[in-house]
Amino acid sequence: MWSGRFSSPVCAPVQSFTASVGFDRAMCHCDAAVLAAHCRSLYLRRVMSIADLADVERGLSEVAMGARAGAISWRPELEDVHRNVEHVLTELVGKAGRMAHTGKSRNDQVSTTARVWLRHMAGAAICRVEELERALAARSRACLNTMMPGLTHMQVAQPVTAAHYLTAYRCMLSRDRSRLVRCTRGACVLTLGSGALAGTNHGGDRYTTADMLGLHCVSPNSLDAVSDRDFVMEYALCCAVLMVHMSRLAEDMIAWSSSIVGFAVLGDALCTGSSIMPQKKNPDILELVRAKAAVLIGGAMGIMAVMKAQGLAYNRDNQEDKAVLLGASRAVTRSLSVMALAVRSLRLNKSRLRRRLESSFAIATDLADSLVWHGMTFRDSHEAVARAVGVAIRAGHAGLRALPLCSRGVVPPLLAARLARIAQPDARVSAFRKDSTGSTSPKWSFRAMRRA
């Protein structure tokens, strides 16, 4: 491609080091679509004949089909998917293939192909997010009245319904889906026609080309267009945040399904065993989701670090964005699929959850509120219940039933009597009493499930 400028060919180590076709060939079908749209633009500008355009379109169709079938021999010495596609096209259709590079640079082609590819992959990720949301919704409906301990600081705090807990993750995923939609919309900008950095002498109607590729608008500045990787950074961050949310869900499911906690059971088909310990049942897929979240966070930070060191315009540093894009998309779509399977297989141990609530002081806050209804200030009622809890713990008693007994001599007799009357060990009462919008009561949990 540039052999006329140099007196010797690029050496093999440099070819190997600079080649990206090993991973960016996944964008082959998108690159073929971009090249076809560009050639149609050349035809409209009367730079390419209708016969040559027909040859190019036929050749690109064969290239795309060959790539899907694994029939293309990718050549690392051609560096990337873009030159490989053009090379195979030229082998198929001859001179018309060599005309395809007229009026464009790899700089604007690379950016446009990545944007088209991102639109497809973000759409696939959105579908997988919706699949996980449906799985969470199904499990939420099945446990609308199932009570479980809600935690703060990893300590039992207050009772919540399992439906409320799972719906919280649906809320996170809903935000993730909205972010992906916004990110996709921002990426749908045509940069083709910007050339290497200054534009092109063979520019056609860029708006028509954008329509051909399903892009919303055209870039207003060629310098910015070829060097802009905001869409990569935004997509990487969207994927990283999504993976953080899945990692949090995975962490909860790992804890629930551990033999020490025993709040839930995962399906056998989703777990693995040990090579030495016969009794083990390991939630490997959930642990891998946690790890992939860390990798994607690193990728998002990495591409921002790559970009912060560059002035205008294009630099070869930007080649590294493909690994981030491809890695993030692959990790997100696969993780979403296995998380949906894990959620569908999840079975809560209702009796274990109930016993854990009964052996805790989870509704102590409700008792303090009840004393407020009897005329105490909340600060005073909080102190009274806290004293009773402290006495119960020091006496070795567990659970709410011990509070009335342990309150004697700790709080005034009248308050102790009130505490005995209102003590209610059924955690469901605590949940049903919550009347604030978005609370854990089944009424609001049901409404949240319908909205999420």
Curated annotation (Swiss-Prot):
It is an enzyme of class 4 (lyase). Residues 431-452 are annotated as: Disordered. Pfam families: ASL_C2, Lyase_1. PROSITE patterns: FUMARATE_LYASES (PS00163). This is Argininosuccinate lyase. One of its GO terms (molecular function) is argininosuccinate lyase activity. The keyword Oxidoreductase does not apply. GO terms for biological process: arginine biosynthetic process via ornithine; L-arginine biosynthetic process. One of its GO terms (cellular component) is cytosol. Keywords: Amino-acid biosynthesis, Arginine biosynthesis, Cytoplasm, Lyase. Pathway: Amino-acid biosynthesis; L-arginine biosynthesis; L-arginine from L-ornithine and carbamoyl phosphate: step 3/3. Its EC number is 4.3.2.1. It comes from Tremblaya princeps. It comes from the Bacteria. Its main location: cytoplasm. Belongs to the lyase 1 family. Argininosuccinate lyase subfamily. PANTHER family: ARGININOSUCCINATE LYASE. It is found in: Cytoplasm. It catalyses: 2-(N(omega)-L-arginino)succinate = fumarate + L-arginine.
